[in-house]
Amino acid sequence: MKLTCVIVAVLFLTAWTFVMADDPRDGPDTAVRGGKRFWKARNEMNSAASKLNKRECLEADYYCVLPFVGNGMCCSGICVFVCIAQKY
């Protein structure tokens, strides 16, 4: 009996999730229940202002922790316990 109730509850919640999910093909006017609000928030996001996009790198002669090429910490990409400048 308990197992049956759990199965029914899981099926109900799964169906509810699919019914209430936002369909990106719908425009902001055709969405159900406050779809405009979510659509507007999605469009107002400024991904260029994200701190995750701004990675600072270490200049030459700074300690770089991970000694291998291409670790992303050094601007040159070469690290042998200190960042090594690349000569072009």
Curated annotation (Swiss-Prot):
Disulfide bonds join C57-C75, C64-C79, C74-C83. Expressed by the venom duct. Residues 22-53 form a propeptide. It is found in: Secreted. One of its GO terms (cellular component) is extracellular region. GO terms for molecular function: ion channel inhibitor activity; toxin activity. Keywords: Cleavage on pair of basic residues, Disulfide bond, Knottin, Neurotoxin, Secreted, Signal, Toxin. The keyword Phosphoprotein does not apply. InterPro entries: Conotoxin (IPR004214). Residues 1-21 form the signal peptide. The keyword Ribonucleoprotein does not apply. It comes from the Eukaryota. The presence of a 'disulfide through disulfide knot' structurally defines this protein as a knottin. The cysteine framework is VI/VII (C-C-CC-C-C). Belongs to the conotoxin O1 superfamily. This is Conotoxin MaIr34. It comes from Conus marmoreus (Marble cone).
